From Swiss-Prot:
This is SAGA complex/transcription factor TFIID complex subunit TAF12. Residues 413-490 form the Histone-fold domain. Functions as a component of both the DNA-binding general transcription initiation factor complex TFIID and the transcription coactivator SAGA complex. Binding of TFIID to a promoter (with or without TATA element) is the initial step in pre-initiation complex (PIC) formation. CDD domains: HFD_TAF12. Belongs to the TAF12 family. One of its GO terms (molecular function) is identical protein binding. It comes from the Eukaryota. GO terms for biological process: chromatin organization; positive regulation of transcription by RNA polymerase II; regulation of transcription by RNA polymerase II; RNA polymerase II preinitiation complex assembly; transcription by RNA polymerase II. One of its GO terms (cellular component) is peroxisome. InterPro entries: Histone-fold, TAF12, TFIID_TAF12_dom. Present with 930 (+/-45) molecules/cell in log phase SD medium.
Length: 539
């Protein structure tokens, strides 16, 4: 499977129209993405296309899915273009540097593909994780190693079972595809396609189960290490050292990247200086060739040559011109006019000497190191006229290069993290607490609760629908489960069942007690009225 949505066989831009082609702005072209995020975007693009094909491209749902896929493809194309341009510029810089150092050498090595780099990175991460786990096994006690092996065996058993199911589903899907290609009648062909869709859905469910299983395994490993570190000081020390080493490695990688950027800048500056020198040399050569043209005999030609020489010396030596003019004036006869003219010339020469720029005492280095502007995360401003800024100039408020915000892909959850954070913020603001922040563990717990609730309700309602022998899931199926088990009622829907209510007939003793209570109340009210009247008469 290729990670490029251009190879998917469907051109999503044709479905969305030509108006979306102008949606990519200059800010998006300056954005930077990692290869992992590009792969996630490509996977999202493929899933949207497959869903649109299954639903139908002409249906409104299919059109919405195709529109979303077209947006993702536009962003992906812009980012891939920027990446290709950067790679081309780097290759050009490398070739120019190699040619400047050794012009006879021709570069034959090709730039490695992004897929190869990603595979190498994945292999490195796997090797590092295996090394880390082996080193931890050496530190663990035999009892802890046994517990770890139990975890690993449970994971392997479930993993193998999922893989067997996956292979079985793949075989059935391949058989159905062959049968669909052989069939000519539309009726049985549609039935086979429906079966194929069911098998594909089962395959997706298996993938989700595997991701959950792997995540649970990773979390259980982390908790196991933490619990063991509480009782095992050697493991505690090893984990601390490993975290420190990881931080040092990250700092080294950052320093290496900065050094590489500085070297690239210096190389570019050297290339520019070489180009400027070459241009100056070419100009000098052209000027020398023009002066070495064979002279024509005659007084006019001699005069023209003398004028050219005088102009060249004047440009190279402005002070010499002043001295020659002074000597020529000294040779002439001294008069009042000549004296005033000489005074004016001396004043102008002194002014030019005063206002001339002096050479700096500190020499300016030819290679000036400048830092490249790093991409900045651009936050969306408030919905006001000026966007929450003092000036309405977007060129001054936006940074030079912007970074793409973290792109949240479909994580197979009912509720996304962004929606949950927005909900918590709104609840906190409504209650007057201000902005409230969720801990990572609490956030994952709430998302798991939402997933469990939705899966439980849907599973039970589907069973009720099957019990009614119907293929459609209706509101009454969900309502029955919610009312009986969760005491939740769906607004706008009422149950079809008729509930009988019993009328309660009180006994004679109960009625006598009620009558005595009411009579006591009446007597107490009369006594209070008589007391108030007697007080008024006394006053």
């Amino acid at each position: 499977m290729s990670s490029n949505p251009e190879n998917s066989g469907v051109n999503a831009n044709n479905n969305t129209g030509t108006g979306n082609a102008d949606a990519i702005t200059g800010a998006q072209q300056n954005m930077v993405l990692q290869p992992r995020q590009l792969q996630e975007m490509a996977a999202k693009f493929r899933t949207l296309l497959t869903e649109a094909r299954n639903v139908g491209e002409t249906t409104p749902r299919g059109k919405e899915l195709m529109f979303q896929a077209a947006k993702i493809k536009q962003v992906y194309d812009a980012l891939t273009l920027n990446r290709r341009r950067q790679q081309a510029a780097q290759a050009y810089n490398n070739t120019s540097n190699s040619n400047s150092s050794n012009p006879a050498s021709i570069p034959t090595e090709n730039v490695p593909n992004s897929s190869q780099q990603q595979q190498q990175q994945q292999q490195q991460t796997r090797n590092n994780s295996n090394k880390f786990s082996n080193m931890i096994k050496q530190v663990l006690t035999p009892e802890e190693n046994q517990e770890y092996e139990k975890l690993w065996q449970n994971f392997q058993v479930r993993h193998t079972s999922i893989k067997e199911k996956e292979t079985y589903l793949k075989q059935n899907i391949d058989r159905l595809e062959q049968e669909i290609n052989k069939q000519t009648d539309e009726g049985p062909k549609q039935q086979l396609q429906e079966k194929k869709i069911e098998l594909l859905n089962d395959w997706k469910v298996l993938k989700i189960e595997y991701t959950k299983l792997f995540n649970n395994y990773q979390n259980s490993k982390k908790t196991f290490y933490v619990e063991c570190a509480r009782h095992n000081p050697a493991l505690h020390k090893f984990l601390q050292e490993s975290t420190q080493q990881q931080r040092v490695q990250q700092q080294r990688v950052q320093q290496q990247q900065q050094q590489q950027q500085q070297q690239q800048q210096q190389q570019q500056q050297q290339q520019q200086q070489q180009q400027q020198r070459q241009g100056q040399n070419q100009r000098k050569i052209s000027s020398s060739n023009s002066t070495e043209i064979p002279s024509v005999t005659g007084p006019d030609a001699l005069k023209s040559q003398q004028q050219q020489q005088n102009t060249i010396t004047a440009t190279n030596n402005p002070r010499g011109n002043v001295n020659t003019s002074q000597t020529e004036q000294s040779k002439a006869k001294v008069t009042n006019v000549n004296a005033t003219a000489s005074m004016l010339n001396n004043i102008s020469s002194s002014k030019s000497a005063i206002f001339k720029q002096t050479e700096p005492a500190i020499p300016i280095s030819e290679n000036i190191s400048t830092k490249t502007p790093a991409p900045v995360a651009y936050r969306s401003n408030r919905p006001t006229i000026t966007g929450g800024s003092a000036m309405n100039a977007s060129a001054l408020n936006t940074p030079a290069t912007t970074k793409l915000p973290p792109y949240e892909m479909d994580t197979q959850r009912v509720m996304s993290k962004r929606k949950l954070r927005e909900l918590v913020k709104t609840v906190g603001i409504d209650e007057g607490d201000g902005e409230t922040v969720i801990d990572g563990d609490v956030e994952e717990l709430l998302l798991d609760l939402a997933d469990d609730f939705v899966t439980n309700v849907t599973a039970f309602s589907c069973r009720l629908a099957k019990h009614r022998k119907s293929d459609n899931l209706e509101a009454r199926d969900i309502q029955l489960h919610l009312e009986r088990n969760w005491n939740i009622r769906i607004p706008g829907y009422s149950a079809d069942e008729i509930r009988s209510t019993r009328k309660w007939n009180p006994s004679q003793n109960y009625n006598q007690k009620l009558q005595s209570i009411t009579s006591d109340k009446v007597a107490a009210a009369k006594n209070n009225g008589n007391n108030v009247a007697s007080l008024n008469t006394k006053k």
